[in-house]
């Protein structure tokens, strides 16, 4: 009997232990969600929204802070623990500063990607550990009953929750590192030219451009709810609080304050004044009360106000989004597909990708000379232009983009460098002047062959010319020689250097005088 009772007792203890462990009843499981601090009553829940929705247009109710210059080696966050007095109340908390927010700050969905879509809730530790957060706090508001993420949430460039234009305080970082605080229209949230890479919604804009902005924020976020008293109580009650903002150096600032609603902690006015003393320029209030949680290096470092299932202990609440400070990361992580992430910085591949995210094409100062498009392989020239910077007109005989097409005109005459039209009528340039005098030039390959043929022709003609010149020289010399010989002979005749031979002697006849003398001597009758 005693042994059976003992076995039953052991079984009962084991069963109770299993059930308690399954339900987290030993002080390390789920909280009771008993320290609830809501800006609006549960009945209203702002389903229809008491304030104005803004879908289009650009509001003037936000502040943009340019990204701070990158400093080598200044990547690790600074975490300060404090115990300060507010109206004679000792209040502990943590203040975190993180340089280069674009690369060191992220908004995380509960339990990882897809958490908002599945309306998941998880403790800050559960969300922060897989993401390698050095510092993590709870983020935006959510519905306690359903786990639905409220307001705008952009995590790593992905929009996972929409406020639908509802005007609550926002804090986000755009792709170029600009810090944005305030109220945004739906159009501004959806901007694609410089989109948000991180964004979350809070309630109440605490500090705007170095001044407390709580009164204006109450009027802007919800006028009618002030009449119920719930929103006014949310602002003025002491409780655990969290906030996010930035200082004048462009560093991200996270504030966490321990407390319990109506018993310990601070109100929003006290939190705003404290942040002003820390040189904070813009800041918004995030979820507080039992949601306020601070995790350092993956370990809970705050005192939650929610009770565990066993009232002896306090347990961290399962919340929605988480704000995370981590080691520098490339933004986006894949460097837009055009680079490699090394020590938090994108090393761009190729010769023309530039920018912190390797998302900008840069073909040099000339920018393709306004005659082409910069691509990842260089300038793609418009029709009629060529060269590495698209600064050269097409040579005669070529046309089209990059001057890749030969003209198809007769005799390889020039064509329009843009259209290839053989009726040349482009603006007067050196090329057109050549065309006007009908000088047609073939493509470069034909020109080379023509030059070789021309060289051969010139050589042949030179040889022929030299031969003819030589023959002419010989002929001239011969003619000169003959001429000089004839002239010498003529001179000899003129000088008397000759013998007279009568023609009769040559013919065997006597001259007439001699005949007469011979006749007289033989005639006896001649007197």
Curated annotation (Swiss-Prot):
Disulfide bonds listed in the record: 116-149, 133-324, 308-315, 363-374, 381-390
Cleavable signal peptide: 1-25
Molecular function GO terms recorded: N-acetylglucosamine-1-phosphodiester alpha-N-acetylglucosaminidase activity
Glycosylation sites: 209, 215, 297, 367, 389, 421
Region span, Mediates the interaction with AP4M1: 498-505
Superkingdom to which the source organism belongs: Eukaryota
Transmembrane intervals: 464-484
Lumenal side: 50-463
PROSITE patterns registered for this protein in UniProt: EGF_1 (PS00022), EGF_2 (PS01186)
Name of a matching Pfam family: NAGPA
Stated role: Catalyzes the second step in the formation of the mannose 6-phosphate targeting signal on lysosomal enzyme oligosaccharides by removing GlcNAc residues from GlcNAc-alpha-P-mannose moieties, which are formed in the first step. Also hydrolyzes UDP-GlcNAc, a sugar donor for Golgi N-acetylglucosaminyltransferases.
Quaternary structure annotation from Swiss-Prot or TrEMBL: Homotetramer arranged as two disulfide-linked homodimers. Interacts with AP4M1.
Protein name: N-acetylglucosamine-1-phosphodiester alpha-N-acetylglucosaminidase
Native source organism of the sequence: Bos taurus
Source species taxonomy: Eukaryota, Metazoa, Chordata, Craniata, Vertebrata
Gene name, Swiss-Prot/TrEMBL: NAGPA
